[in-house]
Amino acid sequence: MEPQPAKRLLNECDTPTRTHYLILGMSWAGWLFDFYDLMLFSFLVIPIKRSLGLSDSSLSLLVGTTLAATALGGIVFGWLADRFGRKTVLSWTILVYSLGALLCGFAQGAAWLAVCRIITGLGVGGEWATGQTLVGETFPARMRGRFAAVMQTGAPLGIAVASVIGGFVEPALANAFGPEWGWRGCFFISVAPALLVVLIRRHMPESDVWLERKRLATPQETSQVKFLLTTPDLRRLFLVGLVLATTDMSAYWFTYSWMPRYLYEHLGSSMGRAGIWMLVTQTGGALGYLSFGVVADWKGRRVAYTIYSVVWAIGLFAVTWFWGALAVYPALTVLFMFLVGLGTGNYSGYGPIFSEIFPTRVRNTAMGAAFNLARGVQFFTPLVITLVATRYGLGGGISLAGFFALITGAWVWTLPETRGRKIGVEGR
């Protein structure tokens, strides 16, 4: 008979405990600073361009290179987390992206900056899957969607912090110490998340599901990657999940990669005002992430995905195609910018869906690879926007996000409904 877990698993508890909230808090903070470090560059792109004399194509390449690096980071750190543990690898990813941010502050040209952004991308790529795997493996099935959504709110809050740093702190530092030190100072500040590693190492427990799975593992088992790719059902789920993540992330990065610049240069907003518009969007995003989890636990993952994708598309088409008309009615402008953020709440679906369709043995590997390969494809997003903008304007390029959002809302129905599915040691 197969040995049984030595004790009750955390995900078998009736209600969340202090340990659950500790895991959630650390994973959430790691994701917040992960997304902050990823997005900060977009809010500093104008002073960086002036300081280093970079072209638009070079800036697009830098954004794309960072996203491509996340793909490699997701695969490598996902495999490491299945091998060495979620807690350990979560710490590694935070140290890596914090190091990348620090080094960006010393950059002297495009090549140097590219290397620094690659380092940032590697760490960023590994953090999400590890944090969501921890939450998915430790929280009870009936409330997994809600708490995965709470972790996901780190993304809009991270962008909000980046918008404040880029829109207000950068000008203040530039005025005080000179233009060169505005954006550099912002990157130096961004090394602070490394302190989070101390708290994780001292206070956060390892996933008990992973520990039990490791205890039961045999030397004869095939590698995680081989098992994932040679098992027909898992391979199909991985590919379908990869397409879902790719279309959704295309919608996301077509929205955000040039949105601050669109607001600043093409709509005549000041950097501070552009930052305020982004804060409106991220307020909607935070509410969207939280409410998505409730809807997903109530009506199912697929229904929630479709609803939020449609809302996202409506908001995007309004602010890119009809901004001139909206400008006459400030309340409508606020509403549709808010809807853009609200629709991105479907990002909260990745964690529970991917946690529930993949077994413990390959969960972190599969989640990290699917999520970050999809994000790596976004290397082409800023390049496509730049190309489309030459004919249809920057708003026309960004509006492509609406079409990808609608595709996502339809494609999610190719995956099974997993609401309420239990996560055990050996499988799903």
Predicted features along the sequence, with ranges:
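Cytosolic juxtamembrane N-terminal segment immediately preceding the first transmembrane helix
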Residues: M1-Y36
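Extracytoplasmic gate region of multi-pass secondary transporters
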Residues: F41-S42, L234-A286
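Helix-breaking motifs and short loop linkers at transmembrane-helix boundaries and internal kinks
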Residues: G53, G85, F106-W112, P140, ...
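Central cavity-lining transmembrane alpha-helices of secondary-active solute carriers
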Residues: G64-F77, L279-S291
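Conserved MFS/SLC helix-loop-helix module at the cytosolic interface between two early adjacent transmembrane helices
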Residues: G73-Q108, K299
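C-terminal ends and interior cores of transmembrane alpha-helices
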Residues: L95-Q108, V311-L326
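Cytoplasmic helix-loop-helix junction between adjacent transmembrane helices
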Residues: C116-T153
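Glycine-rich segments within core transmembrane alpha-helices of 12-TM secondary carriers
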Residues: G145-E170, P193, F371-T381
